Amino acid sequence: MSDPYMPLTSVRSGAGFEAAKGVHGLTVQIANVYFIQLPSEPHSFVLIDAGMPQSAGVIVNEAKQRFGEGFQLKAIILTHGHFDHIGAIEEILEHWDVPVYIHSREMPYVTGKEDYPPARPDSKSGLVAKLSPLFPRHSIDISSHVQALPEDGSVPFLDEWMWIATPGHTPGHISLFRDDGRVLVAGDAVITVEQEKMADVLIQKQELHGPPAYFTPDTETAAESILKLAGLEPEALLTGHGIPMTGKNFRSDLTELANRLSSI
């Protein structure tokens, strides 16, 4: 059973947006999900992450608007298993019998075997950080649908994409990259809003930040993951929280952010 609705939101909640060629985004309260279109099947897509609890209807309605009533959901790729990225997955799977893929190190958190560590409300100042002990961190069990991503870095159904291990925020966090357009779907490895601060979350103030500190137990590894992403030289940065960034100006900022995090 999914968690109850959580009254955390932003001014962009419910807004769909074209994130990159063939990639459509949707802000679900405080988190983003992405619909990646299959090039050969214009009405088919892979869903990246599954939003906040009780958001299945919003996600499905956006899919209908973007891909038509006869849309085909091929699979769901999870960047990790935190509540704001898997919130609607159980309800979605009740209606669509599709495979779910996640890094092997995240499997315990989505097969009912292990809960995430407790939140760290004092890791960084801000009201959201203070509230973080109230956020769900328990495991869900979607054993009948979930499987580990291929070890070779390929992404099922998405031949142009590769997945990259970006641990730190969680042990098996991943990001996705497509060379065409140098598009990076970062998940929470790096985000574009200071997620710890309620006011910034509410207005979606665009700034480059590391993963939410209150749910990031390994800051040093998170910094190494950001350096890895900087090395990809992305030109479109699509994050789990915040407004996407495009161009090349943010590349050096990624390196500076990693260096700043590693010194904490």
Curated annotation (Swiss-Prot):
One Pfam family matching this protein: Lactamase_B
**InterPro entries assigned to the protein according to its UniProt record, in alphabetical order:** Metallo-B-lactamas, NDM-1-like, RibonucZ/Hydroxyglut_hydro
EC numbers listed for it are 3.-.-.-
What does the note accompanying the cofactor annotation read?
Binds 2 Zn(2+) ions per subunit.
Q: Where does Zn(2+) 1 bind?
A: 80, 82, 169, 188
Q: Where does Zn(2+) 2 bind?
A: 84-85, 188, 241
List the keywords (alphabetical): Hydrolase, Metal-binding, Zinc
Gene3D superfamilies membership? Ribonuclease Z/Hydroxyacylglutathione hydrolase-like (3.60.15.10)
SUPFAM superfamilies cross-referenced by the UniProt entry: Metallo-hydrolase/oxidoreductase
Name the cofactor(s) required for activity, per the record: Zn(2+)
- Induction profile: Expression is under strict control of the medium composition. Induced by citrate, probably via the two-component regulatory system CitT/CitS. Repressed by rapidly metabolized carbon sources like glucose, glycerol and inositol, via the carbon catabolite repression system. Is also repressed by succinate and glutamate, albeit to a lesser extent.
Q: Which GO terms describe its molecular function?
A: hydrolase activity; metal ion binding
CDD domains attached to this UniProt entry: yflN-like_MBL-fold (cd07721)
Q: Which family does it belong to?
A: Belongs to the metallo-beta-lactamase superfamily.
State what protein this is by name.
Probable metallo-hydrolase YflN
